[in-house]
């Protein structure tokens, strides 16, 4: 009989401890849920701030953007794809025939006037494959292309290739002739808009 009573007491103690344990777990879960709610609220505030700044930097700011919550920011790839390629940039392969030119797109911070800007791309072609270099007397091939990326954040960048050549960018495409030794200027067949500097000297072209 005593054994039965002891067993019953032990069972009651066990049940009581289980109930206490369950209550503790429930309380812990409630605390976790409350903490998660606080975190979610903070995240919502951050998202609103992000949308506010995105609205300030957008090309056409809309008040509705301030209240929109996005689960994730736009990817870099989608931002890059949204930049249109200018016809001049697409035709840049004709500037130095035979040279391995790879048109590239770069992002710069938006300007104060809500206009999207691209990073300036400098393409330098060395040699044209025709004619001879006056200094060495040898014929060079257009196999060297270097891209120089300018991080100039001014609205109107000033680019200097030499003391004699310094221009303020005001057009979508500017041609620079860094030397007076170019003897001839030709255009590729079927495209009269993109001049080719037919010289073994280095040619420079600025596209943005």
From Swiss-Prot:
UniProt region (Disordered), positions on chain: 126-151
UniProt biased composition (Low complexity): 131-141
The organism's place on the tree of life at top rank: Eukaryota
Protein name: Putative uncharacterized protein DDB_G0292776
């Amino acid at each position: 009989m005593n054994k039965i009573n002891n067993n019953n007491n032990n069972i009651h103690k066990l049940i009581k401890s289980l109930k206490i344990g369950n209550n503790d777990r429930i309380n812990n879960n409630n605390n976790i849920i409350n903490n998660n709610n606080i975190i979610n609220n903070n995240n919502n505030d951050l998202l609103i701030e992000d949308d506010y700044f995105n609205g300030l930097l957008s090309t056409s700011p809309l008040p509705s953007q301030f209240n929109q919550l996005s689960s994730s920011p736009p990817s870099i790839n989608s931002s890059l794809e949204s930049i249109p390629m200018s016809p001049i940039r697409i035709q840049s392969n004709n500037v130095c025939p035979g040279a391995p030119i790879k048109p590239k797109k770069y992002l710069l911070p938006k300007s104060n006037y809500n206009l999207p800007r691209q990073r300036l791309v400098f393409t330098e072609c060395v040699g044209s494959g025709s004619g001879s270099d006056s200094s060495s007397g040898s014929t060079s091939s257009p196999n060297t292309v270097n891209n120089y990326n300018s991080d100039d954040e001014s609205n109107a960048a000033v680019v200097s290739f030499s003391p004699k050549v310094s221009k303020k960018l005001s057009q979508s495409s500017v041609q620079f002739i860094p030397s007076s030794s170019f003897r001839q200027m030709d255009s590729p067949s079927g495209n009269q808009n993109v001049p080719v500097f037919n010289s073994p000297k280095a040619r420079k072209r600025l596209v943005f």
